[in-house]
Amino acid sequence: MSTRGASLEGAGRGGNPPPETTAVRLHVEQASYAYHVTERGAPQFALGPVSFKASRHEIVSILGPNASGKSTLLKLLAGVLKPISGFVRIDSFEASELEPRARAQKVALVQQESALLFPLRVWEFVLQGRYPYGKRLRFESEEDLLMAGNALAQVGATDLRERWMDKLSGGEKQRVILARALAQQPSLLLLDEPTQHLDIGGKLELLRRLRRLADENRYTVIVVTHELNLASEFSDRILLLHRGKALAYGPPQEVYKRELLEPVFDAPLDVELAPSGRPRVMLRDANGAPWSSRNSN
């Protein structure tokens, strides 16, 4: 196993990051959450104290098996849940204390796909991202239409504008959902398993777009994913969770270590350097020989 490599500060950006990258956008300090308490009054923690910071232009991937606390943490970052200890701050504002419209102008949460309640065309769906800026239920001001159009252009979906949402392919729909989030003009993008149901080509296209959005528009992007190797290739930092605890946070080459990953994912693993210089995780069979990495791509 080899985990050697250069530091990934600013990795994925083709060199040193711009000076403003050092500006902290998201600050999480000793944040924890419990969904309920036992009969004796003891809290049952879904997430223990977690601390990390993320800056402009950065992509941070949150990794961990099922029930590790990933979705709970994402809701804390979005301000949907309030931590029972510590804090979550976006641009120095407490996320859970922001009025809903103000919060929606700072953070956009892209959750796993849900069914539409009624038919919508793509432009109507993306226009919903402008709701935090309006005073009426329906928004069709010139500014709103312009921002919705810009959001579609950012994800390469301008040609989909008049299509019905239920007629889109998985990859097309994922781009449009991302466009609706961008129409909010947030500084922080939160995505829950955005590559789910996409083929490998669709996954790579989506992650390249996220990388470009972070680089060119100063977004901070937080991605919950189970795709270890894709996360390694596109992320600046990795947060590894297990059973509600944060085990490691740092560049992929600091986190992708066999002794850390094997107990978390309960599988025999090898870690090697890919041609890109990023860590690559491979399963080992019963004889210790590496399997194809198709199951961890």
Regions found by a protein language model. Give the residues of each.
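The feature captures the beta-strand-to-loop junction immediately N-terminal to the Walker
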Residues: 63-65
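Helix-to-loop junction immediately C-terminal to a conserved catalytic motif
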Residues: 78
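Conserved ABC transporter NBD signature motif
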Residues: 86-94, 103
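Conserved ABC ATPase signature
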Residues: 164-168, 172
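Conserved catalytic motifs of ABC-family nucleotide-binding domains
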Residues: 185
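Catalytic Walker B motif of ABC-type/P-loop ATPase nucleotide-binding domains
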Residues: 189-193
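ABC ATPase nucleotide-binding domains
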Residues: 264-297
